[in-house]
Amino acid sequence: MKKIAVILSGCGSRDGSEIHEATLSLLAIDMNGLEYQCFAPNKNQTEVVNHFTQAQEQENRNMLVEGARIARGNIKPIDEINASDFDALWIPGGLGAAKNLCSYFYDGANMKVLPEVETAIKSFHKAGKPVVALCIAPVIVAKVLGANVTSGKDAGTASKIEAMGGKNTVCNYDEIAYDAEKRVISAPCYMLDASISQVWLGIKKAADKLKEIL
């Protein structure tokens, strides 16, 4: 069975992995007869946000510990990812991708990528293995690989992707961008004002495309 490494960035749309996107990703991977293993950096999030009030909280939360909520405890530190053990890499969105896995939320096109995340992306790419990124996470792949990705219809994000050396493809909620040369698949998800069922259509299409090219 083909195996997919999934990188989480916490638990929650405002400061970690977007829970709908992460859960639907695992469902889509599983429905395609693929196996997954979740990973996350064993580091504190840059912020903790109260998802009810939207206020920033004065506390620390660990990405690995928080990601374990989504993974039902079956999660490993990101430095244990070995591209030779997996067939593809998958990164759900959520502001944790833009705050914790990289500094895009704070620095825009001048962002830095967490070294462990950059190493993982480069190792899969070097091995010729696909990378899937959802929502805001494609900015990371654009920065690291200069890939053609989608930010939905967000012109501001698109311009920053291009400033970082990537290319942007405008997509609706039920569409994906596929960079055949770099083997990168991306879907806009909640970069659009979409319902959970609409987000599912894009994620399922990304998973279907992944299975097709594996």
Regions found by a protein language model. Give the residues of each.
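Glycine/small-residue-rich loop that forms an oxyanion/phosphate-binding "nest" at active or ligand-binding sites
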Residues: 58-74, 79-84
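N-terminal beta-loop-helix "entrance" segment that forms/cooperates
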Residues: 39-65
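Accessory recognition modules or surfaces
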Residues: 1-18, 47-57
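Active-site-adjacent pocket-lining segments in enzyme domains
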Residues: 5-31, 35-37, 74-214
